[in-house]
Amino acid sequence: MSLPEPLLRADWPRERLLRHGAATLSDPELLALALRTGVAGCNAVQLGHDLLRRFGGLRGLLGTSPAELQVVPGLGTAKACVLAAVLELARRTLEEDLVRQDALANPDLVRRYCQAALGHRKVEHCIALYLDARLKLIICAEVARGTLTQAQIYPREIVREALRHHAAALILTHNHPGGTAAASAADIAMTRQIRQALALIDVRLIDHVIVAGAATVSMAAQGHL
């Protein structure tokens, strides 16, 4: 069996990125640039392929903790931390956009942020996006973390944080790991309870976005608020 010929330098991911831009590279090639080197018997691009296959694609890979990544033979602390940093940079880019823009006027940006923050999580998390009077992001804070099927959310904690940050409005988002993005009866009841609690301090609940993998559902758009 003949082995594949080595890539010409002009075909290396770094050289192609410099000539044609990052968008021309495949996912394994982009990962190869982040990883910089491969491991024994496996170059960086092959390692990228292997990681995507092992963890079920980019979302699964980038949602994996550094400790879980280090289980891969040859993938040490440095490479695992680089991959974790890549996801965090992507999330912070979207967060930066929310600081600058009206969240109500940019529902797609909100949806993408929620998906980036929660789509890969393996247990339920609930996050609150606290907004100022111009509906720009003040701070994003985790308000609950639970199990595979539920997270206990306390309206009083959300109200307290809204007062502390002088918020005028907020958006909630939580994930359904391994499920669908459809709002359950419990989701609807809790959301309305939180909306009523916030109304007492004159804070608007604009939306509650449910995330399941790549799917998102706006409870406001579905008439549940």
From Swiss-Prot:
GO MF terms held by the record: metal ion binding; metallopeptidase activity
Residues of the MPN domain: 103-225
Pfam family, one: RadC
Cystine pairings recorded for this chain: none
Lineage: superkingdom: Bacteria
Motif annotated as JAMM motif, chain positions: 174-187
Listed GO biological process terms: proteolysis
PROSITE patterns reported in the protein's UniProt record: MPN
UniProt: Zn(2+) binding residues: H174, H176, D187
UniProt keywords, alphabetically: Hydrolase, Metal-binding, Metalloprotease, Protease, Zinc
Listed InterPro entries: MPN, RadC_JAB, RuvA_2-like, UPF0758, UPF0758_N
CDD domains according to UniProt: MPN_DUF2466 (cd08071)
Family under the similarity heading: Belongs to the UPF0758 family.
PANTHER family in the cross-refs: DNA REPAIR PROTEIN RADC, UPF0758 PROTEIN YEES-RELATED
Protein name: UPF0758 protein BP1235
Organism: Bordetella pertussis (strain Tohama I / ATCC BAA-589 / NCTC 13251)
